[in-house]
């Protein structure tokens, strides 16, 4: 039934109204058809993107889980999606249990209950019959030391919480916090707060025991020996630092920087002196350990053998024998022989061998002269 048409209308008017309604319906169908076709064509693309997002998230989860569990990524390179999700759930549950345990350990009510129970047990131990007085005293002393250690740990945790609450404070100069144990070396590094974090982390190696030796703690922070106030603050890298407030005068900042530079120069000079002393000691020790060197004379091949056998005899002869020109024979009255002049032997005229001073050396190369062979002649 077409609305707006009465019985008094002519057949032509009725036909035109029906045709117009059909045309409108066809136009609406033509408009809806492209929308549906676009949705069908975009559906595979959206599905592909969704799967890509899922795969990327799973890969990131796998990397994080392997790093958290300290496992080798090379051995677990191929993990199924179900394994990745299962490991993630287990890791989150473990973290949740650890956080709950830490909260319970830091809860003052639970700690007080634990200390009360510990004290009751210690009292019961003191009532054991048959214990020696010395042994009982040592046992009670040990138990009291244990409970005092629990109190010290509680105080340390409360202090850490107080330091964590000061993270929102603004700073101009950063100083590393004093050590929590005697084994740690105290350090000081004044750094401008407006600078980069890298510069502040690189300058935290300079030690200054003179600064943290007499630090006084107060409700408002710490006070240095020169009366300067610092506030504990946690840095982005996780370390705790003492921070100067913004109201600090510029003169005090410059004074602190000058003190730090002077102390650093003194440390460098002391290190250089220690290095020089160590080097001198090493050189002296090396000289003491070096072997003695003996001078050896140079000899030729031709005179080496002869001089080796006769040098001792020649040198032992008295020097007066070489000074005499002739030999005195016995008197003719007692002998029938005629006197005869005797020339001094060539061997006697050979002077004493004087060793020339040679350079010290462990290895001496001998100079060997090769003599030319002469042909034999009968005349």
From Swiss-Prot:
Protein name per Swiss-Prot or TrEMBL: Protein hairy
Listed Basic and acidic residues bias regions: 29-47
UniProt region (Disordered), positions on chain: 20-50, 167-208, 298-345
Keywords: Developmental protein, DNA-binding, Nucleus, Pair-rule protein, Repressor, Transcription, Transcription regulation
UniProt organism field: Drosophila virilis (Fruit fly)
Record keyword Transcription regulation present: yes
UniProt function note: Pair-rule protein that regulates embryonic segmentation and adult bristle patterning. Transcriptional repressor of genes that require a bHLH protein for their transcription (e.g. ftz).
Subcellular location: Nucleus
Composition-biased stretches (Low complexity): 182-207, 301-328
Motif (WRPW motif): 376-379
Residue ranges annotated for the Orange domain, each copy included: 114-143
Domain annotation bHLH: ranges: 38-95
Primary location: nucleus
Record-level Gene Ontology MF annotations: DNA-binding transcription repressor activity, RNA polymerase II-specific; E-box binding; protein dimerization activity; transcription corepressor binding
UniProt-annotated stretches for the region Interaction with Topors: 36-55
Quaternary context: Transcription repression requires formation of a complex with a corepressor protein (Groucho).
Domains: entry comment: Has a particular type of basic domain (presence of a helix-interrupting proline) that binds to the N-box (CACNAG), rather than the canonical E-box (CANNTG). The C-terminal WRPW motif is a transcriptional repression domain necessary for the interaction with Groucho, a transcriptional corepressor recruited to specific target DNA by Hairy-related proteins.
PROSITE patterns for this protein: BHLH, ORANGE
Gene giving rise to this polypeptide: hry
GO biological process: cell morphogenesis; open tracheal system development; periodic partitioning by pair rule gene; response to hypoxia; salivary gland morphogenesis; tube morphogenesis
Gene Ontology cellular component list: nucleus
